From Swiss-Prot:
PROSITE patterns: AA_TRNA_LIGASE_II (PS50862). Its cofactor is Mg(2+). It is found in: Cytoplasm. This is Phenylalanine--tRNA ligase alpha subunit. One of its GO terms (cellular component) is cytoplasm. It holds the Pfam family Phe_tRNA-synt_N. GO terms for biological process: phenylalanyl-tRNA aminoacylation. Tetramer of two alpha and two beta subunits. It is an enzyme of class 6 (ligase). Signal peptide: none annotated. It comes from Pseudoalteromonas atlantica (strain T6c / ATCC BAA-1087). Binds 2 magnesium ions per tetramer. Its main location: cytoplasm. Keywords: Aminoacyl-tRNA synthetase, ATP-binding, Cytoplasm, Ligase, Magnesium, Metal-binding, Nucleotide-binding, Protein biosynthesis.
Amino acid sequence: MDLDAIIKEAETQINVAQDASTLDAVRVDFMGKKGRMTELLKGLGKLSNEERPAAGQKINQAKQQIQQLIHQRGELLREQEMNSKLAAESIDVSLPGRTTEMGGLHPVTRTINRIESFFAELGFSVKTGPEIEDGFHNFDALNIPANHPARADHDTFYFNPDVMLRTQTSGVQIRTMEAEQPPLRIISPGRVYRNDYDQTHTPMFHQVEGLMVDKNVSFTQLKGILHDFLNNFFEADLQVRFRPSYFPFTEPSAEVDVMGKNGKWLEVLGCGMVHPNVLRAVNIDPEVYTGFAFGMGVERLTMLRYGVNDLRAFFENDLRFLKQFK
C-alpha cells in the first residue's frame, strides 16, 4: 500500500473543495465506513503478527493527517463563507443617512387653527354640525324664505327639496341656539358646498362663522373684535373698513375690507347684528337679547395671507405647492 500516494490524493481533493458538501464527500471517500482508510485498516488482518503493529501505526498516522487536512479546509471554508456574508451585509458608514421626511399641516388647516386660537382667547368655543342639512337650519331659520335666490338650484346641491349639502355653517349656530340659552360665544368651522368652480371658487370650501348672543351686544363690539382679529391674523396694523351690505340673517349688515399692499381694498369677510327673526326662530327674545354674527371663507384668507393666486391649488394635492407651507 502506498500511503503517501493516498495522502497526496486526499490533500489534492481536499484543497479543491469549494464548499462544505464537496469537502464532506471527500471525507466519506477516505474516512467513511467504506472509505479507503477503513479498507486499509481491515486489511491488517492479512499481515503477520510482526508486520501488523507497524503497518497499523502508519495507517493511523495517515488517517490523522487526512483528518487534520479536512478540519483545516473546513475552517477555511467557514471563514470564507462568513466573510462573504459580512461583506454582503456591511454598512457603509460614510453613506449619508436616510432622513424621514415629516409631513406638514395643509395651509387651510393652518388657517383654521389660527382662527380658532384667536377666538378661543376671547372665550369663543368651537361647535360643529352636519354637512347634510335640512331646509329649516340651512335657510328658514336664517330668515331666508322659500323664494330667496340663495335657495335656487344653481347655487345649492339638493338631495330632495328639503335635504341638501349645507351652503354655510350658519346651521351650526341655529342648532346651538336651539340647544343652549344665552350668553353664547361660538365659532363654527367646517366644509360648505356651492355649485361654483373657477379661479376663486370651488364646489367645496371651508368657512368659519362666529356668533355672540347676550344682553346689550353692540355693533361696536363686533367692529372691535373683527379689527383685532384681522390685525392678529395678518400680523400687521391694517387699515380696515366696514362697508354697508345686505345679508338676510343680519341687520344691519356689513362687509369688511382691508387695504392691500397694492393700495386697493380687499374684501375679507361679512358680518352684522343678528336679525330679530333669526332669534325668534330659535325662541330667543330679541327684546332681551341681541347678538352679532360674522363669516369668513378660509381659503380666501389663506390666499391673502400666503399670496396664493388660484384657490384650486389647495385641492390639487401637488406636493411642490404644499411643501412650501411646512
